[in-house]
Amino acid sequence: TGSFKTVEELCQPSKAQSDLSINNVRATILGGGDMWWDLNTARYEVPKGSNKHSMFAGSLWLGGVDEGNQLKLAAMTYRQAGNDYWPGPLTTDGTASTNKEICDKYDRHWIVLREEVDVHKAWLECLEDPNCNDAELFPGYESQIPESIKEWPGNGVDGELPYQLAPFKDRDGDGVYDYLVDYPAYDIDKEYDC
């Protein structure tokens, strides 16, 4: 027998959980492809603070055909029969595989606020402007850059993955996320018509 291991042997199901509070909704999202519950109770509250939940749970259902023309489906139903979603990116070598190190590293949500990105973008632009005094406008900012911006997974947590993950504004066009040059993508300058 070979040394093939299944994803279940390599990775644990995601434990990442975050609460979103947007407009008049408070909702829980999970890292395992499901959302709006905490594995026991409803967590999609509208209006927030009312203890009224319009949905109990939901999940991503994705399907497609592989290179061998075989239908593949990933669909969660209350995590009752296995797990179809694992933390982190998959390899691009044709195997679409992962490993425990990647699963552990990516079992989290990266939350960045628009206000943080606005300040960071303004600081980066100030650094390039000879008429802008960054020490006066952004005193001590470089040593206080938010972790959410420093750790943004544009190319992998440690840059070990060769492809882009989370979207970012690539200001120097090198394809590599560097928080001292780039910032997490928000359409701040209204460049996109969506």
Task: For each feature predicted by the language model, list its residue ranges.
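A long-range scaffold signal marking pre-active-site subdomains of enzyme folds
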Residues: 1-194
